[in-house]
């Protein structure tokens, strides 16, 4: 092999030398053609001398046909062509004349040329069978190496498949563990609420009527004014410390206390907050679990008194704070009161009741509380406001031009104010809040939320003070509390068909889309129809806004195929889909009614004003559609069937 390498190197060196020599002697390209003009077609025709003609010319016997020519053929209105060829390519005699000149002028170069000829003959006279055998050996080695690599890759693929299966199993276990942790957290919170509610039976057993701080400040006693503020309570009146005598017929009964008389003093009453707790059935019987508590704070010694108001609250735990203006009330002078006392004997039982009271007027104090309603109404806007089927969608009205081509803007239909929330682009972690539409048009944002996990798509909604979105590149949906700024709920959609590849191009609509209508919160996502066509169809499901749970009885598989529509929205429990998003003249071409489980083709015109609509959401409070079209924010008024 060493000889072959050196031989090849020497041959390459000599070849390059000869090439350089030919350039020195003026041997250039055979034919060179140049053309000029805008409309030009050129053709060169070369007629060289033959070897016989060359020998005749050299011998002096030249004929008429012994000549060489280079003809130029051109065509076109604006054309200029020229063809040139070196004499060596047209006249073979030139090569012989060059050799003779080289012998005379440079004998060393002639020797070099002869050496090159010798090397070329040696190269072609070698045993090519040996080279062929070496090549076969190399090919067999390459085949063996390829088979070995395939075997190793197969093993590695099997190992990777097993690893992926193990990881998926671990993920399923982790999901189960996360559900268990959520249930444990709920149980712990329930236990905490029960511990808070346990004070009511204990206070009842101790006969303190929920008065806090009475042991520390014995002079602050509950008077008739306090009892008027808590008329609906079922707890017994508190016992004071000073005893008094009582008359009995058959035996002596322990005396009942009478509060000390006090002079009227003006005291401000400030209701700091109202807290609602969930009531159990047994605790309802004890009149303690469903109470609303208010703390009354007086100016003297900071004594706190607890007012318990009976109520039947069966909803989930609702904790609300309420502000109230402080009022002045006169502390009444307590009057002696003899509480009912029962005397017993062997034959008769006599009950003596003596009550002396003085009417005292107090200023009216109003507690303005707002209760969200029963559990069945937590996911509803207002059932009575549902208009029914769409008759038409009016022309869009442009509100503002803001942000990038893709995005979403929305309002909370439950909120009383007109705050606007914007997500610019279809991937990110920022939610921008504007106080109203005027501030949005001026670009004056009032709040900026950075969610802990990135959102993707434009199918987000804001509902009941929370931001609902799809976590990027996952099947998870998240509820982000805007007031507390933390993730309040997290759920995995098991049957969703999700493309986990990086979608750096807008595909027409979001994979997971939220919607809000008169009945509450919905989620729209693609799933595989394993029962019939094995195709990917759109599924709509009612969501519990508290924990994002999904029930089978409120989940419907529609006949709408994935990637066959532009955008969709839900009104009054009916899913509507627009056929295109990137054409101005669109149409609502599909509707699915969850009440009757039927589908139809409404064929209602829908205008994509700027031919790139990335979001359409319905606002049940305003009865309009919010849309983001190529960086423009639009609203559509919806007309319903009368």
UniProtKB/Swiss-Prot annotation:
Secreted is among the record's keywords: yes
Coiled coil start-end: 150-176
GO-annotated cellular components: extracellular region
InterPro entries, per the entry: Olfac-like_dom (IPR003112), Olfactomedin-like_domain (IPR050605)
Protein location: Secreted
Organism in which the protein naturally occurs: Xenopus tropicalis (Western clawed frog)
Subunit composition and interactions: Homodimer.
Superkingdom of the source species: Eukaryota
Protein name, per record: Olfactomedin-like protein 2A
Region named Disordered: 211-265, 285-304, 330-353
């Amino acid at each position: 092999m060493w000889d072959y390498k050196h031989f090849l190197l020497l041959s390459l060196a000599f070849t390059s030398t000869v090439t350089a020599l030919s350039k020195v002697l003026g041997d250039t390209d055979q034919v060179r053609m140049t053309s000029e003009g805008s409309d030009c077609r050129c053709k060169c025709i070369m007629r060289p001398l033959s070897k016989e003609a060359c020998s005749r010319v050299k011998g002096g016997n030249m004929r008429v046909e012994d000549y060489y020519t280079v003809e130029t053929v051109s065509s076109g209105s604006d054309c200029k062509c020229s063809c040139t060829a070196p004499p060596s390519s047209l006249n073979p005699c030139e090569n012989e004349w060059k050799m003779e000149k080289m012998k005379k002028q440079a004998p060393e170069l002639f020797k070099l040329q002869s050496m090159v000829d010798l090397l070329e003959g040696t190269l072609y006279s070698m045993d090519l069978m040996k080279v062929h055998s070496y090549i076969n050996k190399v090919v067999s080695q390459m085949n063996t190496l390829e088979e070995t690599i395939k075997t190793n890759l197969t093993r590695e693929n099997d190992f990777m498949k097993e690893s992926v299966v193990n990881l998926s199993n671990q993920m399923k276990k982790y999901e189960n563990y996360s559900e268990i942790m959520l249930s444990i957290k709920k149980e712990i919170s329930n236990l905490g609420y029960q511990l808070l509610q346990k004070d009511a039976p204990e206070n009842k057993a101790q006969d303190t009527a929920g008065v806090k701080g009475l042991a520390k400040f014995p002079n602050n006693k509950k008077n008739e004014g306090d009892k008027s503020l808590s008329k609906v309570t079922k707890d017994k009146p508190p016992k004071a410390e000073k005893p008094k005598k009582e008359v009995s017929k058959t035996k002596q009964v322990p005396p009942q206390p009478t509060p000390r008389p006090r002079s009227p003093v003006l005291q401000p009453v400030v209701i700091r907050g109202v807290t609602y707790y969930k009531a159990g059935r047994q605790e309802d019987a004890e009149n303690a679990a469903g109470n609303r508590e208010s703390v009354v704070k007086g100016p003297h010694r900071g004594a706190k008194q607890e007012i318990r108001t009976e109520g039947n609250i069966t909803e989930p735990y609702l904790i609300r704070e309420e502000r109230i203006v402080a009022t002045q009330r006169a502390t009444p002078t307590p009057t002696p009161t003899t509480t009912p006392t029962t005397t017993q004997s062997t034959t008769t039982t006599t009950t003596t009741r003596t009550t002396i009271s003085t009417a005292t007027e107090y200023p009216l104090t109003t507690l303005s509380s707002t209760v969200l309603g029963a559990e069945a109404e937590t996911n509803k806007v207002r059932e009575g406001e549902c208009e029914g089927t769409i008759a038409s969608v009016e022309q869009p009205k442009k509100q503002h031009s803001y942000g990038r081509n893709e995005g979403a803007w929305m309002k909370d239909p439950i909120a009383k104010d007109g705050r606007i929330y914007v997500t610019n682009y279809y991937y990110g972690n920022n939610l921008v809040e504007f106080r109203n539409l005027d501030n949005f048009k001026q670009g004056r944002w009032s709040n900026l939320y950075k969610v802990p996990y990135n959102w993707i798509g434009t199918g987000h909604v804001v509902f009941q003070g929370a931001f609902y979105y799809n976590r990027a590149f996952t099947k998870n949906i998240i509820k982000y509390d805007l007031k507390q700024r933390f993730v309040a709920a997290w759920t995995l959609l098991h049957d969703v068909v999700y493309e986990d590849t990086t979608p750096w191009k807008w595909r027409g609509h979001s994979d997971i889309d939220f919607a809000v209508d008169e009945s509450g919160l919905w989620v729209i996502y693609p799933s595989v129809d394993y029962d019939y066509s094995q195709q990917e169809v759109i599924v709509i499901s009612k969501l519990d806004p508290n924990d994002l749970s999904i029930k089978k009885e409120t989940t419907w598989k529609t006949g709408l195929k994935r990637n066959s529509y532009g955008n969709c929205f839900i009104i009054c429990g009916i899913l509507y889909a627009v056929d295109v998003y990137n054409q101005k003249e669109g149409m609502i071409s599909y509707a699915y009614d969850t009440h009757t489980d039927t589908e139809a083709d409404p064929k209602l015109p829908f205008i994509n004003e700027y031919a790139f609509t990335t979001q359409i959401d319905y606002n049940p409070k305003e009865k309009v559609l919010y849309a983001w079209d190529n960086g423009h924010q639009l609203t559509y008024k919806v007309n319903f069937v009368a």
